């Protein structure tokens, strides 16, 4: 069984584009859950470009599955996470000038911070994952820092312009997933996954969960949000069933 985390950031992006009260990320989360999502992922960025504090607070008590809150390692975000108390927090790198998260967190370069934030969140009963590139050293450092969950960054795979490069990136992800699992870690993956490239990733047996947002929200424009979620879940499950 493989789980689908629906990222609802870009529902909020559409709302923020006009400064309206709609579409509601909370409503989108509930629709995603009723359509087969196993958890809801959202990124409260420091610049608040899409998800807002009020979205997180309103969503927390009404979700029937799990909340996976993505956040940068800052005192402000730690305070928010401790107050909201989601089931999961995923520590991610963040740059104000980026369009979307550009790569995995450099655990080796920020080891002390990763260990500190992982410890504080774990003490509060929140499961911590680290968004990292599919690299053995980064995975080992995440484990050493106390994380027992990782999310492998699949962006290089998704953006590979040629089949040979895509296969090479897929091999890296497979190896990373195997290594993480050998340490006893829960291995998730995400970033840039869509209806055309998700199946090879979903077929990796060590991967427990995929977090996907932009592709689902975009496809929903044509087929509706419930159907977009159902189609993605079906693709993932068919890949795993082989």
Swiss-Prot record:
Organism: Chromobacterium violaceum (strain ATCC 12472 / DSM 30191 / JCM 1249 / CCUG 213 / NBRC 12614 / NCIMB 9131 / NCTC 9757 / MK)
Record-marked site positions (Transition state stabilizer): 151
GO biological process assignments: pyridoxine biosynthetic process
Protein's gene: pdxJ
GO MF annotation terms: pyridoxine 5'-phosphate synthase activity
Assembly and oligomerization: Homooctamer; tetramer of dimers.
Protein name according to UniProt: Pyridoxine 5'-phosphate synthase
Family the UniProt entry places it in: Belongs to the PNP synthase family.
One Pfam family of this chain: PdxJ
Top-level EC class as recorded in UniProt: transferase
Catalytic activity: 3-amino-2-oxopropyl phosphate + 1-deoxy-D-xylulose 5-phosphate = pyridoxine 5'-phosphate + phosphate + 2 H2O + H(+)
Keywords annotated in UniProt: Cytoplasm, Pyridoxine biosynthesis, Transferase
């Amino acid at each position: 069984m493989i789980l689908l985390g629906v990222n609802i950031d870009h529902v909020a992006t559409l709302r923020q584009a006009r400064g309206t009260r709609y579409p509601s990320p909370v409503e989108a989360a509930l629709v995603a859950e009723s359509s087969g999502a196993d958890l809801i992922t959202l990124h409260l960025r420091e610049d608040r470009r899409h998800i807002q504090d009020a979205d997180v607070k309103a969503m927390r008590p009404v979700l029937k599955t799990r909340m996976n809150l993505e956040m940068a390692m800052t005192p402000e975000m730690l305070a928010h996470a401790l107050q909201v108390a989601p089931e999961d927090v995923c520590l991610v790198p963040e740059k104000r000038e980026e369009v979307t998260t550009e790569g995995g967190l450099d655990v080796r370069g920020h080891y002390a911070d990763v260990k500190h934030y992982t410890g504080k969140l774990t003490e509060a009963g929140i499961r911590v994952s680290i968004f990292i590139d599919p690299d053995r050293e980064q995975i080992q450092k995440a484990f050493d820092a106390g994380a027992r969950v990782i999310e492998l960054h699949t962006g290089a795979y998704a953006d590979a312009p040629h089949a040979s490069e895509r296969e090479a990136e897929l091999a890296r992800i497979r190896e990373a997933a195997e290594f993480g699992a050998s340490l006893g870690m829960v291995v998730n993956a995400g970033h840039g996954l869509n209806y055309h490239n998700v199946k090879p990733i979903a077929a990796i047996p060590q991967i427990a969960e995929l977090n996907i947002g932009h592709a689902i929200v975009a496809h929903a424009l044509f087929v509706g949000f419930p159907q977009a979620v159902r189609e993605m879940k079906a693709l993932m499950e068919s890949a795993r069933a082989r």
